[in-house]
Amino acid sequence: MELVNICKEAGVPDGVVSLLSGDPAEISNELMESDIIKKVSVTGSTRVGKIILKKAADKVQRVTMELSGHSPFIVCEDVDMNKVADIAITGKFRNNGQVCISPNRFYIQENRKDEFVNAFMERAKKLKIGNGMDEGVDLGPLTTAKRLEEIEKLVDTTKKEGAKVLMGGQRPSGFNKGYYYEPTVFDDVKDNFTIMKEEPFGPLVPILTFKTFDEVIERANDNDLGLCSYLYTNSMDKAHIGSEKLESGCVAVNTGVVAIAEAPFGGIKQTGYGREGGSGAIKDYLNVKYTHMGLKI
């Protein structure tokens, strides 16, 4: 909403940028059924994206889809664990984990796992929960009551499947209102657990270990979603091989920054298709026309 206000203040003519707020299903139906709309870009869950894609098929409507992500966060043995923990904290708990590119599946090389977990939890325990508009607050609430309910359900499921809660796993004390949930770290997680298949979209951190680089790449790719991958290593060979073999639209190597305006951003698999950002993004909004013209006849 603020962005639309800025456009207006900057002198963008009325009608160039419009904002609709209301029932998402009703608004999307209206847009998809309109003959005026020539292109639709969707940011949302894979479930919702599939619904809109079916509607688009009736009109052969052009769409760009940036859907769910379930990003792996791979930490090799040759890195500074304190530096990686700093990146992990910022990336994981930005907007309390409610970001499509949030790292969700943490794979740590087994001989450095304890070091990473200790460094990560030391930082996570210092995060202040509260009103996001207040000074010094690091973690605000989840977006809705439904999101809080789904997080609690996933935590219960993860524990029942055999995971151990190292920290968190509950609503914070002293918060009688709002959809707050503590940063939660799990140990003893296996690849077939629900949390490794479904995007948590919240402050949940499952920790797993790996022995070899080839093994962890294969395990990281064992998912229907492919938005972003994070890889931390001081080996340029592993950095290049990992960036090529990881099945995602974006790869961040030794950094937590992956989405920038000048670069193409988007996913593969059931995360969708099309790109936002970069010079290539505008192509989805243009028609390609070929004309073959003789000089005279």
Regions found by a protein language model. Name each.
Residues M1-S28:
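PLP-dependent aminotransferase-like
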Residues L20-D23, T43, G91, N254, ...:
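Conserved residues at the C-terminal ends of beta-strands
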Residues S21-L53:
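A charged, well-structured terminal subsegment
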Residues P24-I27, G69, K211-F213:
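Short helix-initiation/N-cap motifs at beta->coil->alpha
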Residues A25-I27, R47-V48, D58, D237-K238, ...:
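Short alpha-helical
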Residues S28-N29, A85, D214-I217:
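Short hydrophobic/charged patches on amphipathic alpha-helices used for structural packing
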Residues I37, I74, K160, S173, ...:
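Conserved C-terminal structural/oligomerization subdomain of aldehyde/semialdehyde dehydrogenase
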Residues K39, R47-K190, V253:
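ALDH superfamily catalytic-core signature
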